[in-house]
């Protein structure tokens, strides 16, 4: 910060004069854009996955007895500001802890902002599905893979229907959407897969000849989107809106486990964290973790769960008063929290 301020002082007059000009984002009377090709990335809001938002549980579970929970399991976010003038970008760099990053890292040239936002929403929905599967697997509860939608004129069109439950593929029981996707990915275009599915309580079997992926004709394509759901009538719904990306997976999964496990995973403490999660419970790295750690610290968290592969970046800034744990799976996160709460051995992130 001192280096930034001294730089500003040496050229104070030119920057002040320039600043008055570049607060305008277009040249008056023209379509000439004066915004800079950078975005400011900083700490975003945090949400308690054990709490409520707009009168609804952030993680709502039906069809099962739900245990009372204590404390916090907060998911964390980063804020992104784009469309800035030079003066606004300089202000973020000088007077905040934001990081300036090339706009192309947020919005690649070959994609529109709407496309990027849609991809982020899809990633967020996928993280919810994986969070549910990982939690059910940890708890030893069965899950089902349901057909959510079907692409018209695709291989599955006219064979599978929305609401069908895929039971096995090529003779192997299906434990989640990822298993179906991986089986199809190992095939070639025009290969066939045999799918056993349940519709209206009746078991059916069909052989489906795989088509071509619309985005890459060399990749086999079944043409269905799938959703994971717990078996036995249990439902899990997530009620956070206007948030994208897959990084809430770990915290969502922990919330589901906490509500169905009969114990306080967090020991009643304020725990925050981040990380993607796969169906098998593997926790993966995410972007902007230094800002997420800052957001958690500002919110009052005592403990932060960081993906092991993000550890050095997670503790690259001041986090005094908050312990940052290194976790690589859902099971590991639960064990580490228990060790922290009971005085056992746990693994912290190192620079």
What are these regions (language model features)?
Residues 6-25:
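Hydrophobic membrane-insertion alpha-helices, especially the h-region
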Residues 259, 271, 279-304:
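Glycine- and Gly-Pro-enriched alpha-helical subdomains that act as flexible
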Residues 34-65, 76-81, 96-151, 209, ...:
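PDZ/PDZ-like peptide-tail recognition elements
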Residues 306-317:
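Short, glycine/polar-rich helix-capping loops at beta-to-alpha or helix-loop-helix junctions
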Residues 136, 156, 163-166, 195, ...:
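Terminal peptide-recognition signature
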Residues 182-225, 316-351:
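PDZ-domain C-terminal substructure recognizer with occasional recognition of PDZ-binding tails
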Residues 156-179, 293-296, 300-306:
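Conserved PDZ fold ligand-binding element
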Residues 19-40:
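C-terminal region of N-terminal signal peptides and the immediate post-cleavage residues
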């Amino acid at each position: 910060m001192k280096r930034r301020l001294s730089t500003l002082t040496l050229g104070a007059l030119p920057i002040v004069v320039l600043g008055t000009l570049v607060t305008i984002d277009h040249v008056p009377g023209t379509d000439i854009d004066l915004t800079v090709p950078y975005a400011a990335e900083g700490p975003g809001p945090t949400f308690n996955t054990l709490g409520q938002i707009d009168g609804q549980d952030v993680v709502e579970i039906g069809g099962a007895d739900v245990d009372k929970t204590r404390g916090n399991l907060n998911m964390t976010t980063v804020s992104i500001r784009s469309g800035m003038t030079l003066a606004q970008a300089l202000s973020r760099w000088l007077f905040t802890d934001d990081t300036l990053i090339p706009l192309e890292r947020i919005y690649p040239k070959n994609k529109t902002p709407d496309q990027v936002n849609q991809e982020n929403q899809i990633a967020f929905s996928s993280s919810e599905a994986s969070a549910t599967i990982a939690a059910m697997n940890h708890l030893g509860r069965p899950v089902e893979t349901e057909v959510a939608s079907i692409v018209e004129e695709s291989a599955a069109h006219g064979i599978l229907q929305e609401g069908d439950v895929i039971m096995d593929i090529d003779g192997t029981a299906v434990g989640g959407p990822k298993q179906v996707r991986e089986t199809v990915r190992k095939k070639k275009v025009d290969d066939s897969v045999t799918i056993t599915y349940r519709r209206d309580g009746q078991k059916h079997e069909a052989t489906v000849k795989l088509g071509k992926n619309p985005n890459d004709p060399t990749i086999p394509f079944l043409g269905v989107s799938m959703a994971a759901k717990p078996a036995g009538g249990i439902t899990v719904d997530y009620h956070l809106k206007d948030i994208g990306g897959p990084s809430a997976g770990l915290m969502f999964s922990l919330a589901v486990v906490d509500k169905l496990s009969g114990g306080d995973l967090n020991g009643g403490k304020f725990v925050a964290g981040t990380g993607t999660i796969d169906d098998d419970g593997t926790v993966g790295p995410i972007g902007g973790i230094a800002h997420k750690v800052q957001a958690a610290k500002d919110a009052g968290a005592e403990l932060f769960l960081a993906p092991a592969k993000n550890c050095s970046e997670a503790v690259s800034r001041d986090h005094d008063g908050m312990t940052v744990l290194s976790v690589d799976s859902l099971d590991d996160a639960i064990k580490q929290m228990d060790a922290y709460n009971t005085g056992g051995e746990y693994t912290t992130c190192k620079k």
